Structure formats: structure tokens, C-alpha cells
Amino acid sequence: MSSFNLVQIVPSLDSGGVERGTVDVANFLAQKKIKNFIITSGGKMIKELDDNLVHVHQLPVSSKNFFSYPSIGRKINKFIQANNINLVHVRSRGPAWMVNLMSKNNVKTIATFHNVYGCNSFFKKM
């Protein structure tokens, strides 16, 4: 398997299925001695992460303010470049927009959309 640097982007790590999946994937990779990253606004589940191989970078990715997305996207892009990230897993619509608005690079992106409450808004469907 070729080496890769993964970053997962999730709004928060407080509680829930998305958060549990994020922590489980990060710790699984750490058990395999694969350094990986999480960008999040914070949360109580951070303490469940392997401190040696899972690196948490806090940015306001839980923001619902669409006008802040380009600025946050640029910060994400700088993080991706500084850490030689070649795989991004976006786990929410807001961060997906942020990643989409950042400058284009050769990073593969996976987006997971968890639709629990319905999807009536045009912007939420994008």
C-alpha cells in the first residue's frame, strides 16, 4: 500500500454517529502506524484519539455562516499543503463547501453526507 496522508474534516467531535466514525477511522489508522489528521471545531471526543498519530487541528468548520467559508477554506488549503495531505474526507455539508471553495489542488476528496432531518433546501442538496 502506498503511503498517504489523510485529513478528516468534521464540524465537531462532541457526540453522534459521524463523530464516532471519525474517531474510529482515525484510531484504526493510528493502530496501523499511519499518521492522520482531523480538522474540527473541537469537542469532548478529542480525548479518545491516539495523541501520537492522530493530530487535531481546530478551525471553525462548524460555522453556518456561508460568507466565512472562503476564509476557512483558505486555512484548510494551507493546512493541506503544509502537511502534504493527499486524501480529504469531508463529513458534513458546510466543510464540503469550504473545501470546494478553496483553491484547487491535486488532493482526492471523499464526501460523506448524513441526511437525518430531510433535505428541502436547494443549498443543502448541493
Report each predicted region and the residues it spans.
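Membrane-interface segments of envelope glycosyltransferases acting on lipid-linked substrates or membrane lipids
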Residues: 1-126
